[in-house]
Amino acid sequence: MNLNDDTMAFLKARQEKLGGELIYKSYATWYGRTDGDKRDFGVFVYSDGRTLVLEDFERTPTILGIRYTPKKKSEYKKLEIFIPVEAICAIDRITRSSAEQSVRDGIDKGKAISLFSKLFRKTVTRIALEDGSAYYLEIADTDKLKKTLNK
């Protein structure tokens, strides 16, 4: 992978912030949380093995690649969440509809899904915490995340 200077500087700053090398990096195209927070745009996901970080960035909306300014501009609220890896009790895949219901209802109702469901339904990664809360991410590499964090 060929990374430009801005990307390299960004990753270096994140490593310095965590105090260790980033051993996991991914990008979630959808994000939800049992506290009702939901993002339909990307969230950067990274870890040094001790802490899992979810972070987003303010962006200009586009339609078919063309930037536009919405009439009602909602106030941007930065997402930057630090999750100690020891607080994570499970990482698995659930249906997106189950994740959306959990976000709406404020309680984690997700159950790991079968291979059949993985093939025929839209799925997301569920990160369940010991306190009963959960994060939901649409990422491509759930197995790599589980292996990296030993979950």
Predicted region positions:
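Anionic N-terminal interaction surfaces
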Residues: 1-67, 75-78
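Acidic, Ser/Thr- and proline-rich intrinsically disordered linker/docking segments
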Residues: 3-4, 8-9, 71-151
